Amino acid sequence: MLKNEEFALTKELTKEQQEAARNFIQVLFQEDLSEFWSILCDIDKSRIYGLYEANHYYDSDVELHGFVQEIRDNVRAVYAPLQGQGGISTKVRYTSEGKMYVYILGSGENPRVYPVGLMPETYIEEERFSQRLQISIYNDEFRNVAL
């Protein structure tokens, strides 16, 4: 669990951040793997592809679609208690590297908090900088799901 002292800034959650966190839970449990892939931040996509290449090197039967599906299944297992949509925090927490965390509270007898990582990605559209929020499933030690 992430502690508040690990964050550089805590602010009120914006509508865009709230929607990104809710959308992540919704997309995570859909069957469409391409939709899951499309919400991941570029850093995580690169990490996944690098891990895939290393695994494929040692086992040529490993294929990318199945590899990504296995990762999604592992992430689904972590967030499974949120399928019925938990309550979303009113705050967003920023790391010193710019990654954001939105907390979702699970339901049940012993509810726990599930952090959803958001990464701002900047791109140029019609000669103007724009930003979109993408999901980050890895923590700073990129080998572990962000819990």
PLM features per residue range, with description:
Residues 53-115:
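Surface-exposed, charged secondary-structure patches
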Residues 6, 10, 14, 29, ...:
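Intrinsic-disorder-associated interaction segments
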Residues 1-30, 46:
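Short, low-complexity N-terminal intrinsically disordered segments enriched in polar/charged residues
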Residues 18-21, 33, 45, 64, ...:
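Short amphipathic alpha-helical segments that mediate assembly, nucleic-acid/protein binding
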Residues 102-147:
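Short beta-strand edge/turn micro-motifs at domain boundaries
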Residues 32-50, 54:
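Short, well-ordered alpha-helical segments enriched in acidic and aromatic residues
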